[in-house]
Amino acid sequence: MAILVTGGAGFIGSHTCVELLEAGYDVVVVDNLYNSSKKALDRVEQITGKHVTFYEADILDREALNAVFDKEQIDSVIHFAGLKAVGESVSKPIEYYYNNIAGTLVLCDVMRKHGVKSIVFSSSATVYGDPAFVPITEECPKGKCTNPYGQTKSMLEQVLEDIYVSDHDWKVILLRYFNPIGAHKSGLIGEDPKGIPNNLVPYVAQVAIGKLECVGVFGNDYDTPDGTGVRDYIHVVDLAKGHVAAIKKMEKSEGGVQIYNLGTGKGYSVLDVIHAFSKACGKEIPYVIKPRRPGDIATCYADPSKAKAELGWEAHYGIEEM
């Protein structure tokens, strides 16, 4: 069985490729390398001793996608490709809506044309907006998303649900992740963004090695124990294993739309993460308090019990191991 992984050279994508290969799947990756590197896939091959078929292509490029589906025997798609920085999405809404929405529509159209109707979609806890309650279950109403990035995820969930309504042969699994951090135990792959990182942990790491001066903590006046934002940080290997569990679930299902939260069920503040990192690397991480970022919320963590019950999946790593 070949699984097409869009955005497979990225942080979560590359870790998912490792888990898929180790579970015995053939993996085909489509990635435009906008915020990733082919080196990640070379390292995936090094870790697993298995081959990854790679196409450098954009999901907006219908011709390129058609060529991939013509050439490869694709059974299912795991769709990661897209722009993903919350803060940047506020300043570049047109790019985010165009890339994420139009790209996914092109992908789904090409899938339909080739009779491939199984997709695991990389969604996000941002679809809950400022959540009505925590811990967040899948029944928590989708809120008003506080940024265009979250809005694209919410809209694409609706698109995929509508596709299923129109054609009951489709199998759709929406995975709403919380905050992925950490790296593969080999140390060969991890989060390696081009330019200044948008996510907390790679930023902290670059401060730790002296690449950046100090960590900017956006807001310390939230209604949380230490005033900084609380998030559910999930190890990327746990998250990757969740995608394999979703593919296995889809193989046995008849069709339909399933939604799962992938998180640990525990919330940690920004300062908790900085202090844990300081402890792990044995040096103080300097930080400075900055104004809140537009689109950020106070508290967000998962109730992951549905994924445990239905996918047989749960997170194993704690914050110290991340």
Language-model features, listed with the residues they occupy:
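N-terminal Rossmann-like NAD(P)+-binding domain of SDR-like oxidoreductases, especially those catalyzing
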Residues: 1-183
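Residue-level detector of secondary-structure boundary/capping sites
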Residues: 24, 150-151, 195, 264, ...
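Pocket-edge positions in alpha/beta enzyme catalytic cores
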Residues: 57, 69, 96, 192-196, ...
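A generic fold-level signal
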Residues: 91, 99, 143, 167, ...
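Short-chain dehydrogenase/reductase
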Residues: 97, 146-154, 190-198, 202, ...
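Short, basic/glycine-rich phosphate-binding loops at helix/coil junctions
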Residues: 182-184, 221-222
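Catalytic core of nucleotidyl cyclases, primarily class III adenylyl/guanylyl cyclases
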Residues: 186-188
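C-terminal substrate-binding subdomain of Rossmann-fold SDR/epimerase-dehydratase oxidoreductases
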Residues: 200-322
